[in-house]
Amino acid sequence: CDLTYDTILLVSDTIPINIGFIASYIKKYLNNEVEISLFKYPNSVIEAIKKNPPDMIALSSYSWNSNLSEYLSSITKKFNPNAITIHGGTNFPHKHELQKIFLQNRPHTDIHTLFEGERALLSVVKRILESNLERKKIFELPIDGCVFIHPDTKKFTKVKQKFIIGKSLERIKDLDEIPSPYLNGILDKFFDGKLTPFLETNRGCPFTCSFCHTGSDY
């Protein structure tokens, strides 16, 4: 999900190429082992959750939708308490001590990816499949490209909660490694006359502006 508030106007009015990239990347490696549905509008995903609660839900986390994503995570947990909720995006601190505080303030978020989401989320999905949806096995070991507070320690005081940090993953240097979500049709339903398509021609940046994450060195 790459959610936008839509009560009065669309806060984010672009076709969600971000989740399109991630879905295309995961399908490239796992194909029919997984079933993926993409969402932009909150009511659509809420209806889908009620009708068929997912085993896992992944949501983007930006300054304009982070709270909305946490709310949808809580709804998912309501209909399937065992569902794995993952957030990813730029609205996340770089320092580990701040990441822990961030997750402590979002109790319905199980896992947060670090930096680019394709490889990190693929790591999560593989772990879920290997664990046969058993929550205890999913969180037994660190997950590459991700951080989480171990579920068994969430009931402890914040100081004693165990913060697990996965191995850092390299940037994807060749964008052709990711199948085009426009060419494979996974974004077709978002051409609804409300959203504007856009393209990504590169990643990274030689500059390190304080207000932007694109030039972050990792």
Task: Set out the residue ranges of the language-model regions.
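A structure-centric signal for secondary-structure junctions around beta-strands
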Residues: 4, 16, 140-143, 195, ...
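Glycine-rich beta-alpha loop elements in corrinoid/cobalamin-binding modules
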Residues: 11, 18, 25, 29, ...
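Conserved post-Walker A coupling segment in P-loop NTPases
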Residues: 172-174
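Proline-rich low-complexity regions
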Residues: 3, 16, 54, 81, ...
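Structured loops at beta-to-helix junctions and adjacent beta-edge loops in soluble globular domains
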Residues: 1, 149-151, 168-169, 181, ...
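Radical SAM [4Fe-4S] cluster-binding motif and immediate context
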Residues: 14, 160-162, 176-218
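Short glycine-rich His-centered loop
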Residues: 1-11
